[in-house]
Amino acid sequence: MNKWVTATIVMTSILTSFAPMAMDKRYVATPQQSTWQMVTNTPLECRLVHPIPNYGDAEFSSRANKKINLDFELKMRRPMGETRNVSLVSLPPSWRPGESADRITNLQFFKQFDGYIGGQTAWSLLSELEKGRYPTFSYQDWQSRDQRIEVALSSVLFQEKYNVFSDCVSNLLTYSFEDISFTILHYDRDNVQLNKASQKRLAQIADYIRYNQDIDLVLVSTYTDSVDSRGVSQDLSERRAEVLRDYFKSLGLPEDRIQVQGYGKRRPIADNASPIGKDKNRRVVISLGRTII
């Protein structure tokens, strides 16, 4: 009886000693595996990706906009089966054992979604990586309640590609598709060319189109004031429309994606009795459409 009790105690002790080893499952690229890839580098978008073996990809991205922006996504091979509370800490690499862990924040990963962080916290991740540390996400495994998952970003080989990413972000256009998708520009009297202020705005639209392959429709509608006769006004608006058709074709857009229409003095938006009203009516409305996948 005593031998049985002793054996049971010994076995229990052995199992207990091994239990903590089964509690955590850690995903991180080894120094030999660690890579950072600049997968998109254009004036419209910057994307920096870090593969995490057997787990998925960590991705930083920033897009053309009025405001500087940064998004981070933890793209998982298997989406979260349940919503989980997540602890985000910054850990030192194994070769710097004297350093302590620093808490960054607490957040949630939602069921059926990849992990997402935006704003200042995303910038904090980059800052920790630049210091050579390992930002680490920790949460309870939704498949095994007695196990926690740890997912770490390796800072090995980070700095070089981060420099490229930073340069890309600094060169992003300072406006988004939404800022230019509907634009009203203006003409001087009896001129088929836009006025100087509108030409600058048109150049912005052109820059966006040059770098975006998703623009599949450009609608151009031109209008005049009421100074001239109906026939003269119609002819002027049609010539203005054709000038813009040629302009958008020169950017590489296929002709079947460009639709232009001259309306002459029809559809005024202001009173033609005043100079200000005439200026407003001498206009072109440019609308852009794009394919969203």
From Swiss-Prot:
GO annotation, biological process: archaeal or bacterial-type flagellum-dependent cell motility
Presence of keyword Cell membrane: yes
Top-rank lineage group of the source organism: Bacteria
InterPro entries xref list: Bact_OuterMem_StrucFunc (IPR050330), MotY_N (IPR041544), OmpA-like (IPR006665), OMPA-like_CS (IPR006690), OmpA-like_sf (IPR036737)
SUPFAM superfamilies according to UniProt: OmpA-like (SSF103088)
Signal peptide: 1-21
Compartments, as annotated in UniProt: Cell membrane
Domain OmpA-like, first and last residues per copy: 175-292
Location (main, coarse): membrane
Null mutant phenotype: Mutant is nonmotile. It has an intact but paralyzed flagellum, and shows a decrease in virulence.
Coiled coil regions in record: none
Keyword tRNA-binding: no
UniProt function note: May play the role of a stator in the sodium flagellar motor, stabilizing the force-generating unit through direct interaction with the cell wall. Involved in adherence and invasion of fish cell line.
PANTHER family for the chain: LIPOPROTEIN YIAD-RELATED, STATOR ELEMENT OF FLAGELLAR MOTOR COMPLEX
Name of this chain's protein: Sodium-type flagellar protein MotY
Origin species: Vibrio anguillarum
